[in-house]
């Protein structure tokens, strides 16, 4: 009997990368302080599957290029304006943080 999950891929070893974050999110959305481990595991599987699918789609879009770029992810999200908008917002915030750090470093070095 084959050991494949519902997506036709072999199951991956769980590393519980998002357990702490998922517990916090679940609590923030009204779950118990200590949610059921099965619930966390299911959500983690969904998150990991989504990330894998997005990375595969971005790599497909990148085609023969050696590197996947942010624009490949943005293109993959083009049909989901809410997610695309959030990506754009996070990119702007990332630039603002980097600029602020540069200013602070400059001020520290020159004053």
Curated annotation (Swiss-Prot):
InterPro entries: Histone-fold, TFIID_TAF13
Subcellular location: Nucleus
Organism this protein belongs to: Schizosaccharomyces pombe (strain 972 / ATCC 24843)
Gene that this polypeptide is encoded by: taf13
Disulfide bonds listed in the record: none
Keywords from the UniProt entry: Coiled coil, Nucleus, Transcription, Transcription regulation
GO BP term (any one): transcription by RNA polymerase II
Membership in a protein family: Belongs to the TAF13 family.
GO cellular component: chromatin; transcription factor TFIID complex
Family annotation (Gene3D superfamilies): Histone, subunit A
Gene Ontology terms for molecular function: protein heterodimerization activity; RNA polymerase II general transcription initiation factor activity
Domain of life of the source: Eukaryota
Function comment: Functions as a component of the DNA-binding general transcription factor complex TFIID. Binding of TFIID to a promoter (with or without TATA element) is the initial step in pre-initiation complex (PIC) formation. TFIID plays a key role in the regulation of gene expression by RNA polymerase II through different activities such as transcription activator interaction, core promoter recognition and selectivity, TFIIA and TFIIB interaction, chromatin modification (histone acetylation by TAF1), facilitation of DNA opening and initiation of transcription.
Ranges for domain Histone-fold: 17-61
Protein name as it appears in the record: Transcription initiation factor TFIID subunit 13
């Amino acid at each position: 009997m084959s050991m494949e999950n519902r997506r036709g891929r072999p199951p991956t070893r769980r590393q519980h990368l998002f357990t702490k974050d998922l517990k916090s999110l679940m609590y923030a959305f009204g779950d118990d302080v200590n949610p059921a481990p099965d619930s966390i595991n299911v959500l983690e599987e969904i998150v990991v599957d989504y990330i894998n699918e997005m990375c595969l789609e971005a790599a497909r879009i990148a085609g023969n290029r050696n590197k996947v770029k942010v624009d490949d992810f943005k293109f993959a999200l083009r049909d989901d304006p809410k997610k695309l908008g959030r990506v754009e917002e996070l990119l702007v915030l990332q630039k603002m943080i980097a600029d602020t750090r540069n200013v602070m470093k400059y001020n520290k070095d020159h004053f």
